[in-house]
């Protein structure tokens, strides 16, 4: 774990700029030109991480509690919440350890600190890769539910989903170990960037195709009932707005981090790039914000999951409240959200 400050996190050796002393200011680069540098207070960073941690724990607990949510789609959502939980948790852990080291509260050998740094970096990198993979898996699952609706339950069986989940976790951990070990190779960073772009393109293509199918379906209903065309236009605009928000949040939260990695490869010594490198912690904060937003988009829009979540929260205050139901929530219509082209 580097000692230059909380900015050096995942692939920490990529960013050795000192932490800014002001929340928002203009720092001078080597030529004296102004350089915008935003500092994220450690308290804010830890608070956002805590919100993400609690939010995703609730999602995992709700899905684990309700047997009606033990479908392939909710398994992917649960794993997305778990990977987001690890993203926020690992970043919080590293920030807390750095603060303890800088304060002199935690004293240990340099070799132990470096080993701990490498372990946390692997955990952070693997959880980030898993988060991206499960976002793609959710898009694929919903695409199949729309275009292969009659065969959906025979294609996306629970054992197949479990094998896909296991493959994602194992591949992410192994890849992260290699990425952290060979972080100073340009090919490694380019692989990460290409992977992000592939996930972005995959999600965009699938969701746009699903939106087009939904618009065609709505148009068919309108023609069947001889309704006016403006209603169809309104549906298309709402769907396009939802899709724009979905992909826009994904790109805005993850894009800056992978832009940072791209610039490290192509212009590591350029003055403008160095100014961008100074905001590395901002990019990590955006990823933490994405882990907060993901449950709102993919989990909490499900009515049954919200009901189960309420039960989980009530039972945390009044133990034994679910004893009559055997500890499992049973709500009718649990598969309604499996058919929507966009997040439930």
From Swiss-Prot:
Q: Which GO terms describe its cellular component?
A: plasma membrane
What does the UniProt entry say about where the protein is found?
Cell membrane
Topology term for the membrane: Multi-pass membrane protein
For this UniProt entry, which segments traverse the membrane?
38-63, 73-93, 119-140, 164-183, 192-211, 241-266, 280-300
GO molecular function terms attached to this record = melanocyte-stimulating hormone receptor activity
One of the protein's GO biological processes: adenylate cyclase-activating G protein-coupled receptor signaling pathway
Segments on the Extracellular side according to the record's topology features: 1-37, 94-118, 184-191, 267-279
Q: Which residues are glycosylated?
A: 29
Give the InterPro entries listed for this entry.
GPCR_Rhodpsn, GPCR_Rhodpsn_7TM, Melcrt_ACTH_rcpt, MSH_rcpt
Question: CDD domains, from UniProt?
Answer: 7tmA_MC1R (cd15351)
Where in the sequence is the signal peptide annotated? Answer: none
So which stretches are on the Cytoplasmic side?
64-72, 141-163, 212-240, 301-344
- Which keywords label this protein? Cell membrane, G-protein coupled receptor, Glycoprotein, Lipoprotein, Membrane, Palmitate, Receptor, Transducer, Transmembrane, Transmembrane helix
- PANTHER family xref list: G-PROTEIN COUPLED RECEPTOR (PTHR22750)
What is the purpose of this protein? Receptor for MSH (alpha, beta and gamma) and ACTH. The activity of this receptor is mediated by G proteins which activate adenylate cyclase. Mediates melanogenesis, the production of eumelanin (black/brown) and phaeomelanin (red/yellow), via regulation of cAMP signaling in melanocytes.
According to UniProt, the name of this protein is Melanocyte-stimulating hormone receptor
Q: What is the lineage of its organism?
A: Eukaryota, Metazoa, Chordata, Craniata, Vertebrata
Gene encoding this chain?
A: MC1R
